[in-house]
C-alpha cells in the first residue's frame, strides 16, 4: 500500500501519516523501556545501571543505521513523487545490497570494540562485565536492525506509515513476553533482555518481508533486487551519510552526557536511565512529526509542487507546537507516577522526578528544531540538519561538564544542559530558514 501526498488537504495528510509513526516509535520505546523496567524490578539496580550506561552506545549504532535508511528514503520519496518507478526501484535495491554489507561489518566491529568503548565512558568496574555482555548481544543483531529500518523507511517514503506500526506492535508484545521469560523463568538477567530484543527485531523483519511480497506490488522487484547502481550509491551515501552523522552526533552528545552522569554515583545513573527513557517517550513524537513533514515535502518537491512544500512546513510547525505544550504539562504533572513504573527506590524516584520536571519546561524548543529539520530534510539540504545537531550536542555536553564537574550542580544540571543545546540549535536554524525562504522569494 502506498500513499500519494502530492494531492489533498495537507493537515489531515500530516496527522494521518504522523500517528502511525508516533505509535510505532512509542511501541519501540516501550519494548526498550521494558528492558529497564524488568531489569530494575527483577534483577537489581546494578543491572539497571549497566543496561542504562550501555544504552547510549547501543542507540548510537541503531541511529547511525537508521540515519542511512532515512537518507535513502528521501531519495525514494522524491523518485516516487516524480513518478519515476525505474529510478525508485534502483534506489531500493542499491540501498538493500550496500546496507547488508555495511551492517554486517559494522556489527562485527561493534562487538569487538564493546569493552574499550564502555571503558572510555568511565563505566564503573563493578558493572562493566554486565554492560559488555548486554551490549555485545544487541550489537550481534544489528543486521536485523538494518533490515527493519530499511524496509520501514522505504514504505514510509511511499506514503505508508501504518504497516510498519502493525509489525512493531507484534514485535513489542513478543519482546516484553520474551523479557519476562528469559529474566524471570530462565534467570538470564540483563542478557535475557538483550536476547529478547534481538529476537523481536528479527521477527519484525520477517513480517515486513512477507507483507511486501503479498501486499506491496511496487516493491515486488524479483531479480531486480539484485540490481546495484554504483553511481546511485554515491548519491545515496551522500544523503545517508549526512543523515546518519546527524543521528550519530545527537547520540554522541548523549554518550558524553552519560559519561558525566557516571561520575555522579549509581543512584544518579539509575535515575538518569529511567528518566531518559521517559524523556524519549516525550521527545520522539516531535521527531516523528518532523519525519512526516520530510516525506510530504520530498514527494511534493519531486512533483514540482513548491507551494505545498511551504504549506506543509506551516502545518507541521503548528502540530509540533501543540504537541510540545501537551507533553510538557503531562510530563511535569505525571513525573512521580511514571518514575515509579521503573524503580521503587525512593531516592532514585526523587532524582528522576527532579530531572523530568525540569526538562519538561523546555519541550517547546525541540518542537521547533524538529519541525525546521523536517523542512530542510524534505528539500534535500541535510547539511543544515547535521550542523545544527552538532552544535546542539557540543554545547549540551560542554554545558553538562561545566554544570556538574565545575559548578557541582545536581541532577537538574542535565536538563539545563539540554536547554543550552536547543537554544544554540535555534540560533543557527532560524537564520538559515529565513535565508532560504528569502532566496526563493518567500516569507515565513
Regions found by a protein language model. Give the residues of each.
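N-terminal transmembrane alpha-helices
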Residues: 5-42, 56-71, 75, 100-107, ...
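Short runs within selected transmembrane alpha-helices of multi-pass transporters and secretion channels
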Residues: 69, 137-156, 164-172, 193-208, ...
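Helix-terminus/linker motif at the lipid-water interface of multi-pass membrane proteins
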Residues: 26, 30-49, 118-125, 181-188, ...
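Short alpha-helical transmembrane segments in multi-pass integral membrane proteins
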Residues: 1-18, 76-141, 185-241, 297-362, ...
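Hydrophobic transmembrane alpha-helices of multi-pass small-molecule transporters
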Residues: 60-63, 175-179, 204-209, 281-284, ...
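Small-residue-rich hydrophobic transmembrane alpha-helices
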Residues: 48-108, 145-164, 271-335, 366-380, ...
Amino acid at each position: 500500500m502506498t500513499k500519494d501526498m502530492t494531492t489533498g488537504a495537507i493537515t489531515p495528510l500530516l496527522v494521518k501519516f504522523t500517528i502511525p509513526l508516533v505509535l510505532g516509535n512509542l511501541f519501540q520505546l516501550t519494548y526498550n523501556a521494558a528492558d529497564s523496567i524488568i531489569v530494575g524490578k527483577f534483577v537489581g539496580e546494578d543491572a539497571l545501571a549497566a543496561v542504562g550506561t550501555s544504552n547510549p552506545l547501543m542507540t548510537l549504532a541503531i541511529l547511525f543505521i537508521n540515519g542511512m535508511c532515512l537518507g535513502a528514503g528521501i531519495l525514494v520519496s522524491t523518485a516516487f513523487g516524480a513518478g519515476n518507478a525505474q529510478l525508485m526501484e534502483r534506489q531500493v535495491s542499491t540501498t538493500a545490497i550496500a546496507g547488508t554489507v555495511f551492517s554486517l561489518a559494522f556489527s562485527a566491529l561493534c562487538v569487538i570494540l564493546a569493552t574499550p568503548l564502555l571503558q572510555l565512558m568511565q563505566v564503573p568496574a563493578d558493572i562493566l562485565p554486565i554492560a559488555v555482555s548486554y551490549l555485545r548481544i544487541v550489537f550481534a543483531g544489528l543486521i536485523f536492525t538494518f533490515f527493519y529500518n530499511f524496509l520501514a523507511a522505504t514504505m514510509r517514503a511511499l506514503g505508508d506509515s501504518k504497516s510498519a506500526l502493525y509489525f512493531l506492535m507484534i514485535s513489542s508484545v513478543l519482546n516484553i513476553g520474551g523479557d519476562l521469560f528469559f529474566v524471570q523463568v530462565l534467570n538470564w538477567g540483563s542478557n535475557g533482555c538483550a536476547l529478547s530484543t534481538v529476537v523481536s527485531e528479527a521477527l519484525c523483519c520477517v513480517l515486513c518481508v512477507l507483507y511486501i511480497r503479498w501486499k506491496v506490488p511496487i516493491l515486488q522487484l524479483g531479480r531486480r533486487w539484485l540490481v546495484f547502481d554504483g553511481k546511485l550509491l554515491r548519491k545515496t551515501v551522500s544523503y545517508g551519510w549526512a543523515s546518519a552523522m546527524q543521528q550519530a552526533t545527537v547520540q554522541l552528545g548523549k554518550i558524553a552526557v552519560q559519561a558525566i552522569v557516571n561520575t555522579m554515583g549509581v543512584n544518579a545513573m539509575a535515575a538518569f536511565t529511567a528518566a531518559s527513557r521517559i524523556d524519549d517517550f516525550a521527545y520522539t513524537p516531535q521527531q516523528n512529526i518532523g519525519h512526516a513533514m520530510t516525506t510530504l515535502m520530498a514527494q511534493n518537491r519531486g512533483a514540482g509542487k513548491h507551494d505545498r512544500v511551504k504549506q506543509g512546513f506551516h502545518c507541521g510547525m503548528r502540530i509540533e507546537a501543540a504537541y510540545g505544550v501537551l507533553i510538557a504539562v503531562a510530563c511535569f504533572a505525571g513525573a512521580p507516577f511514571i518514575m515509579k513504573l521503573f524503580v521503587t527506590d525512593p531516592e532514585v524516584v526523587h532524582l528522576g522526578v527532579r530531572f523530568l520536571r525540569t526538562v519538561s519546561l523546555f519541550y517547546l524548543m525541540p518542537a521547533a528544531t524538529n519541525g525546521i529539520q523536517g523542512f530542510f530534510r524534505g528539500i534535500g539540504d541535510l547539511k543544515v540538519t547535521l550542523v545544527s545537531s552538532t552544535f546542539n550536542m557540543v554545547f549540551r555536553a560542554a554545558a553538562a561538564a561545566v554544570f556538574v564537574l565545575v559548578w557541582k550542580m545536581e541532577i537538574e544540571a542535565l536538563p539545563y544542559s539540554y536547554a543550552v543545546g536547543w537554544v544554540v540549535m535555534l540560533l543557527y536554524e532560524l537564520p538559515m530558514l529565513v535565508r532560504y525562504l528569502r532566496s526563493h522569494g518567500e516569507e515565513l
